[in-house]
A protein has these predicted regions:
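Class I SAM-dependent methyltransferase SAM-binding "motif I" and its flanking Rossmann-like core
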Residues: 17, 91-166, 211
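Short, solvent-exposed amphipathic alpha-helical segments in soluble enzyme
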Residues: 23-28, 49-53, 102-106, 131-132, ...
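Short gly/pro/ser/thr-enriched loop/turn and capping motifs at secondary-structure boundaries
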Residues: 43-44, 62-64, 121-125, 142-145, ...
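Class I S-adenosyl-L-methionine
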Residues: 1-18, 23-120, 125, 224, ...
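Phosphate-coordination loops involved in phosphoryl transfer and adenosine-cofactor binding
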Residues: 5, 83, 167, 254-256
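Conserved anion/nucleotide-ligand pocket segment
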Residues: 150-198
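Signature of uroporphyrinogen-III synthase
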Residues: 2, 16, 205-328
């Protein structure tokens, strides 16, 4: 179903890997009049936007907001009021630390119809890509999703006493710069210093990096690893299962960046295969195949009955030759 005029779609774009974007999300992007996106979405998703679509970067980084939340809210209301089909793209799921609830409330108050399109949340998919199940029958029967980012006035600090007493898994969003503070807070609240911890950077993407340790050691390990955001912190005994279940980072081409220079029409299948093997693929076509008028080719094709062997130096030659053969 295409995006409808005058409606705002709050769309989750998944944790970063293009393959984890839902079909509904792609469909809405492809029919949007206005597209407002955050920085954590897969860049390739923007290529689905149609010609003439207003594409607006509303990306937020720590201490560097392209647009304030109030400005984003105003954009959504204004664009929809003009009868435009508006897609608001967010990393992960819009209702899991995505401020989708705030934007939905603003739209409701303004009388603007909206729909929520759920996405794959990073809180579950990113640990999975690091070989860490957030629940396990013999290890953890519950998971708690927490934001490690406090408000400007210092409010919103995690309830370390409650988390320290939990025997389940704790997943903390937006905490890379606060790893030491989180670890110290949990230990001060009584959590064992040996409690396993993982920090996963750029999860589900070919640039994923994972550091594991304990509450006591994780701060130094993260500093030494020079991890970058976005990153998740996973605390709990399930982290130890990574030794058995680390599948994503064990693929044969993981950690390798490969540039594919084939013509665009032919590059996608190769690029997909390389990505399935774990590679970070950059498609950079350096050639373009164009048909030429070659009246003599048909004569050559007809004369091949007396030929013992045909040698083709590229797929393009095969396509051109047999196209002429079928036409004769």
């Amino acid at each position: 179903m295409s995006a409808r005029p005058g409606v705002v779609y709050l769309v989750g774009a998944g944790p970063g890997q293009m393959g984890l974007v839902t079909g509904r999300a792609r469909e809405l992007v492809a029919t949007a009049d206005t597209l407002i996106y955050d920085r954590l979405i897969p860049a390739a998703l923007l290529e689905y936007a149609p010609a003439g679509c207003d594409v607006i970067d509303a990306g937020k980084r720590a201490g560097d907001h392209t647009l304030s939340q109030e400005e984003i809210n105003a954009l959504l209301v204004d664009a929809a009021s003009q009868g435009r089909a508006v897609v608001r793209l967010k990393g992960g799921d819009p209702f899991v630390f995505g401020r989708g609830g705030e934007e939905g409330a603003c739209l409701q108050q303004a009388g603007i119809p909206f729909e929520v399109v759920s996405g794959v949340t990073a809180g579950i998919s990113v640990p999975a890509s690091a070989g860490i199940p957030v629940t396990h029958r013999n290890v953890s029967n519950h998971v708690t999703l927490v934001t490690a980012s406090a408000g400007p006035d210092g409010s919103g600090e995690p309830d370390y006493a409650w988390l320290a007493a939990s025997e389940g898994t704790v997943v903390l969003f937006m905490g890379l710069r606060r790893v030491r503070r989180v670890a110290d807070g949990l230990m001060s609240a009584g959590a064992p210093r040996t409690r396993p911890v993982a920090v996963i950077s750029r999860g589900t993407t070919p640039r994923q990096r994972t550091v594991t340790g304990t509450l006591e050691t994780i701060g130094d390990l993260v500093d030494a690893g020079q991890l970058v955001s976005p990153a998740l912190i996973v605390v709990g005994d399930v982290v130890e299962l990574r030794d058995q279940l680390n599948w994503f980072e064990q693929r044969p081409l993981f950690g390798h960046r490969i540039v594919v220079t084939r013509a665009r029409a032919q590059a996608s299948s190769l690029a997909t295969h390389l990505r399935d093997l774990g590679a970070d693929v950059v498609e950079a076509p350096t050639i373009r195949i164009e048909p030429i008028n070659d009246d003599g080719l048909a004569d050559h094709v007809r004369s091949c009955a007396d030929t013992d062997m045909l040698i083709f130096t590229s797929r393009n030659g095969v396509d051109r030759w047999f196209g002429a053969l079928h036409a004769t």
